[in-house]
Curated annotation (Swiss-Prot):
The modification Phosphoserine is found at S17, S18, S20. Keywords: ANK repeat, Cytoplasm, Developmental protein, Differentiation, Meiosis, Phosphoprotein, Repeat, RNA-mediated gene silencing, Spermatogenesis. One of its GO terms (biological process) is spermatogenesis. Interacts with DDX4, PIWIL1, RANBP9 and TDRD1. Plays a central role during spermatogenesis by repressing transposable elements and preventing their mobilization, which is essential for the germline integrity. Acts via the piRNA metabolic process, which mediates the repression of transposable elements during meiosis by forming complexes composed of piRNAs and Piwi proteins and governs the methylation and subsequent repression of transposons. Its association with pi-bodies suggests a participation in the primary piRNAs metabolic process. PROSITE patterns: ANK_REP_REGION, ANK_REPEAT. This is Ankyrin repeat, SAM and basic leucine zipper domain-containing protein 1. It is found in: Cytoplasm. Its main location: cytoplasm. It comes from Colobus guereza. GO terms for cellular component: pi-body.
Length: 475
């Protein structure tokens, strides 16, 4: 009896009989036929070896222990299974071994699924993508949410894994699901500043108008987190990318998502009109039509072109001369945002007349750009709704935004009138001050003229927006 007990104790590696297959792993039991050893000590020892093998990622030892009878769904600390642990470290080879041994890909602990664990893993995107692909191939549900109502695609978007996001959508993940705070995958990507994720989600049909529980859209979230490039991208009126992949089959979508750049150049599966019609118009309008084929080959849309940085221009083969043309055109088209955080430092009592005049001129120029932009939109809008080619959301969305614009313009007009009254009051006081040396009449007349032009411009802009609003309501 004592001898039997001694035979069951762990021994040093290499001390087993020659028949043992576990010499190098120090499994340490000799009598495999003993029911007592099978029921008690060997199983506990195997579990301990299994945990250590999982920790160091020893796939061959894990496979050996699984073959010896260790349960593939045995639980570790916090109730995690081996598969969940392997997914958390993005060990694709280990995930494959465990799945092939029958591990449950749909296991969850406290509303934490293995797929969510894989999507939020710390590792290379290549390894995470392989893990996610393996789990999806074993029917892991991509729409099961955690306790915070976050789904796998939200975690992937938050962490910047573009290919993982696309793969999840190809397997049925809902793009516009919202978590407990009203965040979508697009909102998370905008918050974290992942431009490529934002572009991909728009292409996959993400709704950029969905608001969080505190009433913020993805563009506003991006702006609040100082991701101005993404803010401009999401604020762009046209959206040729939206829903671009929604009509494809699952197989075609996966093929499109996972092909290399060279494959995309060889096999471009989308309609050039749908993806590049507006781009061609833009390029022809500024005399750069020779760039059309180049941008098509690289799958660059107008939205992407308008948000490119200088290094991206060079990387995509756009010459310095062409870059200057594009940037010059954008400077004319875009309304430069006034940094009001800086105005508090500029508008002081010591401000010179020239500086204040420059501020008013800049404000007037901004209003002029806005008026031109609205005029262009009005002339470009089709009179008949049947002539609208691109996919449009409900006109009610546009009408509500126009109403808000009209209100903002009215507020701006009111504030400009207040500014004019304050300046007029200061001017009258100075004219009545006997100690003040009068300026030349020409300067006074010029300042008054600038104020009048500013007020007229703002009122004119409000009138144009009112006309635009009526146009949408008529439609």
């Amino acid at each position: 009896m004592a001898a039997g007990a001694l035979r069951g104790l762990p021994v040093a590696g290499g001390g087993e009989s020659s028949e043992s297959e576990d010499d190098c792993w120090e499994i340490g039991y000799l009598d495999r036929t003993s029911q007592k050893l099978k029921g008690l000590l060997p199983i506990e020892e195997k579990k301990e070896k299994f945990k250590k093998a999982m920790t160091i990622g020893d796939v061959s030892l894990i496979q050996e222990l699984l073959d010896s009878g260790i349960s593939v769904d045995s639980t570790f600390q916090y109730g995690w299974t081996p598969l969940m642990y392997a997914a958390s470290v993005a060990n694709a080879e280990l995930v494959r071994v465990l799945l092939d041994s029958g591990a449950n890909a749909s296991f969850e602990k406290d509303k934490q699924t293995i797929l969510i664990t894989a999507c939020s893993a710390r590792g290379s995107e290549e390894q995470i993508l392989k893990c996610v692909e393996l789990l999806l191939s074993r029917n892991a549900d991509p729409n099961v949410a955690c306790r915070r109502l976050m789904t796998p695609i939200m975690y992937a978007a938050r962490d910047g894994h573009t290919q993982v996001v696309a793969l999840l959508v190809a397997h049925g993940a809902e793009v516009n699901t919202q978590d407990e705070n009203g965040y979508t995958a697009l909102t998370w990507a905008a918050r974290q500043g992942h431009k490529n994720i934002v572009l991909k989600l728009l292409e996959l049909g993400a709704n950029k108008m969905l608001q969080t529980k505190d009433g913020k859209m993805p563009s506003e979230i991006a702006k609040r987190n100082k991701h101005h490039e993404i803010f401009n991208l999401l604020s762009f009126t046209l959206n040729p990318l939206e829903g671009k992949l929604q009509q494809l089959t699952k197989e075609d979508t996966i093929c499109k998502i996972l092909t290399t750049d060279s494959d995309r150049e060889k096999d471009h599966i989308f309609s050039s009109y749908t993806a590049f019609g507006d781009l061609e118009v833009f390029l022809h309008g500024i005399g750069l039509e020779h760039l059309t084929d180049l941008l098509k080959e690289r799958d660059i849309t107008l939205r992407h072109l308008l948000t490119m940085r200088e290094d991206e221009f060079t990387k995509n083969g756009i010459t310095s001369e062409d870059q200057q043309k594009i940037l010059a055109t954008l400077k004319e088209l875009q309304v430069e945002e006034i940094q009001f955080g800086e105005l508090s430092e500029e508008i002081k009592l010591e401000i010179s007349g020239d500086e204040f005049l420059n501020f008013l001129l800049k404000l007037n120029k901004q209003c002029g750009h806005l008026i031109t932009a609205v005029q262009n939109i009005i002339t470009e809008l089709p009179v008949n709704s049947q002539k609208i080619t691109l996919e449009w959301a409900s006109p009610r969305n546009f009408t509500s935004v126009c109403e808000e614009l009209v209100n903002n313009v009215e507020d701006l007009s009111e504030e400009v009138c207040k500014l004019k009254d304050v300046i007029q009051k200061l001017q009258n006081e100075r004219e009545n001050d006997p100690t003040h040396i009068q300026l030349r009449e020409e300067v006074s007349t010029w300042n008054s003229r600038i104020l009048k032009r500013t007020a007229i411009t703002v009122c004119g802009f409000g009138f144009l927006l009112f006309i635009c609003k009526l146009t949408f309501q008529r439609k």
